[in-house]
Swiss-Prot record:
Designated name of the protein: High frequency lysogenization protein HflD homolog
Compartments it resides in: Cytoplasm; Cell inner membrane
Chief site of localization: cytoplasm
NCBIfam families (alphabetical): PRK00218.1-2 (NF001246)
Source organism of this protein record: Vesicomyosocius okutanii subsp. Calyptogena okutanii (strain HA)
Lineage: Bacteria, Pseudomonadati, Pseudomonadota, Gammaproteobacteria, Candidatus Pseudothioglobaceae
Family matches, as SUPFAM superfamilies: YcfC-like
Length: 203
């Protein structure tokens, strides 16, 4: 898999998590298949995109979101872009805090090895949410989620959002491991759009 393809899929994985978060905050539900794939990425240790997201449908939501962003139709997904930029900033802070990084790595290793529940099970989501809250949740500025209060005040939904924020950090890490940088979007916009169209044609 070439570098641009890897970077594009990794960027799509970031936007997928933020899209799912926006769906949860706005409607209380989100795309089930993409949710499973994004949460599972947290406990998949590989840095190869085709191993983390190994089915074509795993990143459909993210690829759709990336296409909208690159088509300059950003007004309708401002929250999604804001969350993505906030996650990139948060991941940068995490990389400078070895104590938090070790804590997160250790807990994820435990979750991966115990494997009591499916990663999308309510208990797994609660555990991932607690991990986010006790580590990344303490860093400033905090990521403020916009949505309907009836959903944001629901414990399971708020846990689910935190779990997906953790998946978003994983996605940013994958993107950076492939050499991803925000200015690449400006330089490679046309190439990325062509690649997305090719990927969509394969589905």
């Amino acid at each position: 898999m070439n570098k641009l393809r890897e970077q594009t899929l990794a960027l799509a994985s970031i936007l997928q998590t933020t899209t799912l978060i926006d769906q949860l905050a706005s409607t209380g539900t989100c795309d089930a298949n993409s949710n499973q794939a994004s949460l599972k990425s947290i406990i998949t240790s590989s840095t190869k995109l085709e191993e983390v997201f190994n089915q074509k449908q795993d990143l459909l939501v993210g690829i759709d979101a990336l296409k909208v962003v690159l088509s300059n139709k950003t007004k309708c997904i401002q929250h999604i872009i804001f969350y993505a930029l906030a996650l990139i900033n948060l991941e940068k802070k995490l990389m400078k805090n070895q104590t938090l990084l070790n804590q997160i790595t250790l807990e994820i290793d435990l979750i991966r090895n115990q494997d009591f529940f499916e990663i999308s099970h309510i208990n797994s989501i609660a555990r991932l949410a607690q991990l986010y809250k006790s580590t990344l949740g303490g860093l400033n500025p905090k990521i403020m989620i916009n949505g309907q209060q009836i959903y944001l005040s629901n414990k399971h939904t708020s846990n689910h959002i935190r779990a997906l924020l953790l998946a978003g950090i994983r996605a940013v890490s994958l993107w950076k491991s492939q050499g991803g940088k925000t200015w690449h979007l400006l330089l490679n916009k046309k190439k990325i759009l062509n690649l997305i169209n090719t990927l969509e044609g394969l589905n």
